[in-house]
């Protein structure tokens, strides 16, 4: 059987386990997914107040046996879980902002982080962590390039408990430790000030005007843009000299919004890089994103020439190699 067919078969077996539990407990797909992986990791089916019933427990026990879960490679478990988490966002009618970030963007961000971050223990946070796939993918790539040394203490914030539970399972599957906080990230953070923030920022309007009356990026009329508020909150909370590696709407970097926002941003931080992503990655021009990299004032931070580039494609290995060559040239000339 071809690898892809094998994986499809395995995915469908996992899917059946999740939907069986979902029906028995009458919960969302995300909740059933979290509990399924908890059951498999702990090798025990959790029963609370008689649910799931004995018949379902027996049925799940047989289904779990057929998975041979303990024999599966870690990477396969992560892959299956990632696809099921994507289904959870779709099926539960969740916000489009909770859709996982394409893995190739984690590679681009990891390449930049490797150049800019100091080689020491660092606190790294995603204040809109969702299922955790962007942060974990970035950290795994940094670890791989660092001879498996894990120099990072990880933190995540989200206001959706179901997403945090999925992020918790994903961290466990990736063999990463993380502290997760359920809160509105526009309110004061409960986490320590991070050395770096990595995030695919939520896009849209923030509905609670009262919470943002002291924000410089708030709107004069009506609701404010959540993505601008997030950037301001990140800058407020980063350590002096700390870095932001953010996926942001392309529209905030130019046009009417950019005309107001960019002068404010460049007074607050040192811009390091703006990377325009391929148009083909997005359904329409309103969804287009760029990678924004900046360094907070303070510490040994200093201004430097900004690394500006557009990625025309990310479909080939060659595109990433070319990007890395340009990045190295900029780093050698400007930073190093």
State where each predicted segment sits.
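Conserved nucleotide-binding/hydrolysis micro-motifs of P-loop NTPases
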Residues: 202-204, 251-253, 281, 297-299
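C-terminal regulatory/effector modules of DNA-binding transcriptional regulators
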Residues: 212, 238-241, 292
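A short N-terminal interaction module
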Residues: 1-89
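Conserved S-adenosyl-L-methionine
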Residues: 98, 102-199, 204, 250
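Short acidic, glycine/Ser/Thr-rich loop/turn "cap" segments at secondary-structure junctions
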Residues: 87-98, 122
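Mobile active-site "lid"/loop adjacent to the S-adenosyl-L-methionine
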Residues: 200-230, 251
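Conserved Class I SAM-dependent methyltransferase catalytic core
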Residues: 223-280, 287
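Flexible, glycine-/basic-rich loop-and-beta segments that form/coincide
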Residues: 286-336
């Amino acid at each position: 059987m071809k690898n892809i067919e094998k994986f499809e078969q395995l995915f469908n077996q996992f899917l059946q386990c999740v939907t069986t539990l979902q029906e028995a407990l009458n919960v969302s797909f995300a909740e059933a997914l979290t509990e399924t992986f908890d059951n498999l990791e702990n090798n025990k089916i959790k029963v609370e107040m008689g649910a799931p019933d004995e018949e379902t427990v027996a049925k799940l026990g047989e289904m779990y046996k057929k998975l041979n879960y303990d024999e599966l490679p870690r990477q396969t478990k992560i892959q299956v879980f990632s696809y099921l988490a994507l289904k959870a966002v779709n099926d539960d009618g969740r916000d489009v902002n909770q859709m996982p970030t394409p893995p190739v963007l984690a590679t681009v961000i990891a390449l930049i982080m490797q150049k800019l971050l100091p080689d020491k223990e660092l606190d790294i946070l995603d204040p809109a962590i969702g299922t955790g796939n962007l942060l974990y993918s970035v950290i795994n790539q940094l670890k791989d390039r660092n001879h498996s040394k894990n120099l990072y203490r990880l933190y995540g914030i989200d206001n959706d408990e179901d997403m945090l539970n999925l992020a918790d399972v994903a961290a466990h599957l990736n063999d990463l430790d993380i502290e997760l906080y359920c809160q509105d990230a526009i309110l004061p953070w409960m986490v320590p000030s991070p050395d770096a923030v990595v995030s695919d920022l939520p896009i849209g309007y923030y509905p609670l005007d009262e919470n943002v009356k002291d924000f410089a990026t708030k709107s004069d009329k009506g609701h404010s843009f959540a993505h601008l508020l997030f950037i301001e909150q990140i800058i407020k909370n980063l350590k002096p000299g700390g870095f932001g590696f953010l996926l942001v709407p392309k529209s905030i970097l130019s046009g009417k919004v950019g005309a107001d926002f960019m002068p404010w941003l460049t007074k607050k931080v040192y811009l390091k890089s703006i990377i325009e992503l391929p148009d083909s990655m997005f359904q329409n021009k309103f969804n287009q994103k760029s990678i924004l990299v900046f360094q907070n004032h303070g510490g040994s931070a200093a201004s430097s020439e900004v690394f500006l580039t557009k990625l025309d494609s990310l479909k080939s290995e060659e595109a990433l190699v070319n990007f890395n060559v340009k990045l190295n040239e900029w780093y050698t000339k400007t930073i190093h």
